Amino acid sequence: RSLISNYFFSDDGNFSFNLIKQIDSFPSSKFFKNYQDKFEKPEDTSKYWIKEQEKINLKNKIFFFKTHNALCKINGNKFTDINNTLAAIYIVRDPRNVVTSIANHYQITTREAFDFMKDKKRGIIEKEGDRFTGFQPLFSWDLHLKSWTENTLYPTLIIKYEDLVMDTTSTFTKVLEFIKGVTKTKNNIDKQKLLKCVENCK
């Protein structure tokens, strides 16, 4: 997210944490907390997923969003569809490294982290008072992976996290070429800005 935000939303490729805010997270609490719905269950916000995306797209411009969601249906409600999503970039990480990352992040054992990854009912939940205002279903690591990598609804670029770390410049170039293709942008990639983004985001 930092690379994309600094390339597209800065004038010169210089890194700024404020620019990261240009790429919002969806579906997060901010999109649903003003509904009058009681949201008694975590998954209740799923009924408004498409509606909120339609509202965003009324602005008739291209937005970038970060999501942890699996590409799924909850209670018959699609996470997104071809009318609201132009394309996706999916970053996949070696599951062995994911276990370590989860263990460090949540201060749990690697065994607990492994069980976390296998949990088919795993999700990220936001709650305000008695209302579940945010829900991102993760599912298990393998189901999450399949949901995006087997997607045929719209173009999906698969990027390995390890490639992004070890060979950031060429990997980010692929990302920019992909974005250029799906958005039908005529402007060439600004190589100097690209290199500056990579250097400043290290």
Spans of model-derived segments:
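Surface-exposed loop/turn and secondary-structure junction residues enriched for glycine/proline
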Residues: 148, 167-168, 201
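PAPS-dependent sulfotransferase catalytic core
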Residues: 192-202
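Phosphate-binding beta-loop-alpha motif at adenosine-nucleotide cofactor sites
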Residues: 152-178
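Non-catalytic, well-ordered alpha-helical segments in soluble enzyme domains
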Residues: 9-10, 171-185
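PAPS-dependent sulfotransferase catalytic domain
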Residues: 1-159, 185
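Short, charged, surface-exposed loops that flank catalytic or proteolytic processing sites
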Residues: 186-190
